[in-house]
Regions:
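Regulatory cytosolic signal-relay segments
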Residues: 1-90
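Amphipathic alpha-helical regulatory segments at dimerization interfaces
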Residues: 32, 80, 124-128, 167-174, ...
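Alpha-helix/helix-capping structural signal
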Residues: 100, 187-188, 210, 229
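A conserved hydrophobic position in a structured secondary element of the catalytic/binding core
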Residues: 97, 185, 226
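Catalytic NTP-binding/metal-coordinating core of nucleotidyl cyclase/transferase enzymes
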Residues: 85-163
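Long C-terminal interaction/binding lobes of large macromolecular proteins
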Residues: 25, 35, 49, 155, ...
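Cytosolic regulatory/linker segments at or just downstream of nucleotide-handling modules
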Residues: 218-264
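Catalytic core of nucleotidyl cyclases, primarily class III adenylyl/guanylyl cyclases
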Residues: 126-160, 171-207, 255-258
C-alpha cells in the first residue's frame, strides 16, 4: 500500500517490527514516560494521558490529545492506525483475567459498591500490566485482556506476562476480589482492524488468543492457569505445579496446563 505522502510500504512489516523488534525502543521509553504522568483515562496504545496535568504536558510537548474519532486512542495513534490498516502475524503472550462469580456479587452488593469493585479491578490490572510493558487490549464487563511482545517488553516478555499474573492474583486476593487468570503464548494477528466509516481498533485475534481467553474461563478464584506452551516459552520449570489437561471449546486437542496460585 501507499502512505498519505505517496510512499510505498509493506504494512505487515511495519506492524511486525513495531510489535516484535527492539528497534522501536524509543516508543517503549515514551510509553513508560507517559504512564508515569497523571491522569487516567489514557491512550490505549501509547499510554498518553488525556486529562489533568499529564494531559496538559503531552498536548504541549507531543501534540497528543484524545482522538475525536476513537476515544480509546490519542489523535496521533489513531491517525497512524488509519494510515497503516492491517497487521502481521507475530509471536506474543496473552493474559486474560476476570472476576469470578461477578453476577452473584452484583446481586449481593449495591450498584455503586459493585461498580467500585470493578473499578479497583480495572485500576489494579492496568497498573500492573503497564509496569511490565504490556498492552491493555480491553476492559469489558468483569474482564481484562492484555498482550506482550518482544518489541514492547524485551525477549523475556512471556516471563513478564506470568509475573503480572502472579502479582495481579496477589493484589486482588488482598482486596477480596475473586479473580481467575489465564496465560498463553503463540502466534496471533496483531494490527489495526477497522470499519467502513473509518473507526479503527488495535487488537490481536486468532486461535491462540481464543485459547488464552478460554483458559481464564476455566480458572477458579485465585488460580492462574498457564499453558505448557507459555511456560516453555518463558523457560520456567513447572514440574512441581499442579498439572491439568483441559478440553476447551473449539480446540480439537486437550490443552496441557499448569496451575499457579499467586507467587510461587
Amino acid at each position: 500500500m501507499k502512505t498519505n505522502d505517496g510512499k510505498s510500504v509493506d504494512v505487515g512489516k511495519v506492524w511486525w517490527f513495531w510489535f516484535s523488534s527492539n528497534a522501536f525502543a524509543v516508543d517503549k521509553r515514551l510509553r513508560r514516560l507517559f504512564r508515569m504522568l497523571p491522569h487516567d483515562p489514557r491512550c490505549k496504545f501509547c499510554n498518553a494521558p488525556f486529562q489533568g496535568v499529564g494531559g496538559i504536558v503531552v498536548r504541549a510537548l507531543f501534540g497528543k490529545q484524545r482522538s475525536d474519532l476513537n476515544p480509546l486512542f490519542c489523535n496521533l495513534c489513531e491517525m497512524a492506525s488509519r494510515e497503516f490498516p492491517g497487521g502481521a502475524e507475530v509471536e506474543m503472550s496473552m493474559l486474560f483475567a476476570d472476576v469470578r462469580g461477578s453476577t452473584a456479587l452484583s446481586k449481593k452488593m449495591r450498584p455503586t459498591e459493585f461498580s467500585q469493585l470493578i473499578n479497583r479491578f480495572y485500576s489494579g490490572s492496568t497498573n500492573l500490566i503497564s509496569k511490565e510493558d504490556g498492552l491493555v487490549e480491553k476492559l469489558a464487563g468483569d474482564a481484562v485482556a492484555a498482550f506482550w511482545g518482544a518489541g514492547f517488553a524485551g525477549p523475556n516478555y512471556v516471563r513478564r506476562t506470568i509475573k503480572v499474573a502472579q502479582n495481579l492474583s496477589n493484589v486482588m486476593a488482598r482486596q477480596g476480589i475473586p479473580v481467575g487468570i489465564g496465560v498463553h503464548s503463540g502466534v496471533a494477528f496483531f494490527g489495526a482492524v477497522g470499519t467502513a466509516d473509518g473507526l479503527t481498533n488495535i487488537s490481536a485475534i486468532g486461535d491462540e488468543v481464543n485459547t488464552a481467553a478460554r483458559l481464564a474461563s476455566k480458572a477458579a478464584a485465585g488460580e492462574i492457569i498457564v499453558s505448557e506452551q507459555a511456560l516453555k516459552a518463558a523457560d520456567i520449570d513447572g514440574s512441581e505445579l499442579e498439572s491439568r489437561s483441559l478440553e476447551l471449546k473449539g480446540i480439537s486437542e486437550p490443552v496441557l496446563v499448569r496451575v499457579m496460585r499467586g507467587k510461587q
